[in-house]
Amino acid sequence: MKLTNNFSLEELTVSQTALRNGIDNTPSSEHIENLRLLCENILQPLREDYNLPLVVSSGYRSKKLAGLVGSKITSQHCSGCAADFTIPGVDNKKVFKHIVENLPMDQVILEYYTEENGGWIHVSYVPNGRGQALTKDKEGYKTW
């Protein structure tokens, strides 16, 4: 099922951990709608702004999958509102700043970024979001 021109439901729900452990990671219709909104408002605009594919490392997580990967069941991944991604060949700090300055995100986190290791970006969308920008490293979260 296509969510936008460049993003499919499968791309935002596939999980090797779920497959290896026999976990059903099928989202509800409400979660699918949240994923569609995330794609329409954040991921697809990024795809078009950079004219490069995004590699989604984590999208929707069922509560069972969240527990298995050490995530909280209150994570926005569990409601279909969040995704973790990179854009190969583009510095994650640059993408992070672009999101902060241009897109209607709820939360964006530049995770484990160093110049040697680009880390990844966590981004979430809900209508009328908080616009919260953070960084995260081994010592925890910091406001951007």
What are these regions (language model features)?
Residues 49-51, 78-82:
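Short connector loops at helix/strand junctions that flank enzyme active sites
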Residues 1-47, 138-144:
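Extracytoplasmic cell-surface/polysaccharide-interacting catalytic and binding patches
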Residues 12-15, 22, 26, 63, ...:
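Surface-exposed loop/turn and secondary-structure junction residues enriched for glycine/proline
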Residues 41-70:
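Extended, low-complexity, intrinsically disordered C-terminal regulatory tails
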Residues 74, 79, 87-144:
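Catalytic cores and adjacent binding grooves of peptidoglycan-active enzymes
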Residues 54, 83, 121:
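A broad, low-specificity signal marking well-ordered, structured residues that form hydrophobic/aromatic
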Residues 3-5, 65, 74:
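Glycine-rich, flexible loop/turn motifs
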